[in-house]
Curated annotation (Swiss-Prot):
Catalyzes the specific phosphorylation of the 3-hydroxyl group of shikimic acid using ATP as a cosubstrate. It catalyses: shikimate + ATP = 3-phosphoshikimate + ADP + H(+). The gene is aroK. It comes from Frankia casuarinae (strain DSM 45818 / CECT 9043 / HFP020203 / CcI3). PROSITE patterns: SHIKIMATE_KINASE. Belongs to the shikimate kinase family. This is Shikimate kinase. Its cofactor is Mg(2+). Keywords: Amino-acid biosynthesis, Aromatic amino acid biosynthesis, ATP-binding, Cytoplasm, Kinase, Magnesium, Metal-binding, Nucleotide-binding, Transferase. The keyword Chaperone does not apply. Substrate binds at residues 49, 73, 95, 150. Its EC number is 2.7.1.71. Pfam families: SKI. The keyword Transmembrane helix does not apply.
Length: 225
């Protein structure tokens, strides 16, 4: 396997911050694909949900249960800021991180990949969702609402959009590596990379989602995952 990170990391346009940031709904495959991509490139993988759990000594589900969503979002904001500042590998954000306007601002200028997933695929992948506090009751209905609300926000922060429908994790990893290779090498523009990856354009994704305003999306989503 090639390692497109090497030249980009040491050359005249060496990048600061994560090589790539993955966003998407629960079931999009951020952790699985991110881990595979990091292994392929020989870099570290980091997940802000795992960072929060390590810092607070408990699970995300228990944080929601014991302290509420507002408390979790504050912890998440701090985790996102810290990871964007000091991680140099592949970074995955929690599904609801884009609800926070400060997080979206922090993502500007980073290579952000939106892993797009449909409701059926997401439900199949998350199962009973015991570790996802906002999906415990009626996961299909809840996921559909989350996707409607968050798609415009994912698209807003995305450099590249990759549709995961019909693809196994290793195939998504291949698409992601192909899309990011030119960007890491300082080559094609983000929209060209998105075309190469088979993903929709961020603006098109937002239009398809109905283009709701960020505040409306946050209200409709009601939480994290």
């Amino acid at each position: 396997m090639g390692e497109p990170a090497t030249d980009a990391w040491t050359g005249p346009m060496a990048w600061t911050g994560p090589m790539v940031v993955l966003v998407g709904a629960p079931g999009a495959g951020k952790t699985t694909v991110g881990t595979q991509l990091a292994r392929r490139w020989g870099v570290g993988f980091r997940d802000t949900d795992a960072d929060i759990e390590a810092a607070l000594g408990t699970t995300v589900a228990d944080i929601f249960l014991d302290h509420g969503e507002e408390y979790f979002r504050l912890a998440e904001r701090r985790a996102v800021a810290a990871a964007l500042a000091d991680h140099r590998g592949v970074l995955a954000l929690g599904g609801g991180a884009v609800l926070d306007a400060e997080n979206r601002t922090l993502l500007a200028g980073h290579r952000v990949v939106y892993l797009e997933v449909g409701v059926s695929d997401a439900v199949r992948r998350v199962g009973l969702a015991r570790d996802r506090p906002l999906l415990v009751e009626g996961p299909r209905t809840r996921l559909a609402a989350l996707l409607r609300a968050r798609r415009p926000l994912y698209a807003e922060v995305a450099t590249v959009v990759i549709d995961t429908a019909g693809h196994e994790p290793d195939e998504v990893t291949d698409l992601l590596a192909a899309a990011l290779g030119p960007l890491l090498a300082g080559g094609s523009e983000p929209d060209e990379a998105a075309d190469a990856a088979g993903g929709s354009e961020p603006d098109e994704a937002a239009d398809a989602a109905g283009g709701s305003e960020p505040d409306e999306a946050a209200d409709a989503a009601g939480g994290k995952r």
